[in-house]
Amino acid sequence: MSGTTGERPFSDILTSIRYWVIHSITVPSLFIAGWLFVSTGLAYDVFGSPRPNEYFTEDRQETPLITDRFEALSQVKSQSEIK
């Protein structure tokens, strides 16, 4: 004999006015917040990744490749030095 879990059926949730009122506000808000997070450059600052114009400097135009996995830290330090 099977019982119920006490949860609302998914079809009841999707046809609920309350569901659509809440989600019609939160989904666009999350989209706008994400767009602002990236477009203002805050995402670059928070995660520490270089901005698109900082990948290549005037002095260093080659691609910085790590070739030795055991000396990777020293290679990263030498490639990130400002010359």
Swiss-Prot record:
Pfam families: Cytochrom_B559, Cytochrom_B559a. Its main location: plastid. The keyword DNA damage does not apply. InterPro entries: PSII_cyt_b559_asu, PSII_cyt_b559_asu_sf, PSII_cyt_b559_CS, PSII_cyt_b559_N, PSII_cytb559_asu_lum. With its partner (PsbF) binds heme. PSII binds additional chlorophylls, carotenoids and specific lipids. One of its GO terms (cellular component) is photosystem II reaction center. The chain crosses the membrane at residues 21-35. Its cofactor is heme b. It is found in: Plastid, Chloroplast thylakoid membrane. It is a single-pass membrane protein. Keywords: Chloroplast, Electron transport, Heme, Iron, Membrane, Metal-binding, Photosynthesis, Photosystem II, Plastid, Thylakoid, Transmembrane, Transmembrane helix, Transport. Heterodimer of an alpha subunit and a beta subunit. PSII is composed of 1 copy each of membrane proteins PsbA, PsbB, PsbC, PsbD, PsbE, PsbF, PsbH, PsbI, PsbJ, PsbK, PsbL, PsbM, PsbT, PsbX, PsbY, PsbZ, Psb30/Ycf12, at least 3 peripheral proteins of the oxygen-evolving complex and a large number of cofactors. It forms dimeric complexes. PANTHER family: CYTOCHROME B559 SUBUNIT BETA-RELATED (PTHR33391:SF9). This b-type cytochrome is tightly associated with the reaction center of photosystem II (PSII). PSII is a light-driven water:plastoquinone oxidoreductase that uses light energy to abstract electrons from H(2)O, generating O(2) and a proton gradient subsequently used for ATP formation. It consists of a core antenna complex that captures photons, and an electron transfer chain that converts photonic excitation into a charge separation. This is Cytochrome b559 subunit alpha. The gene is psbE.
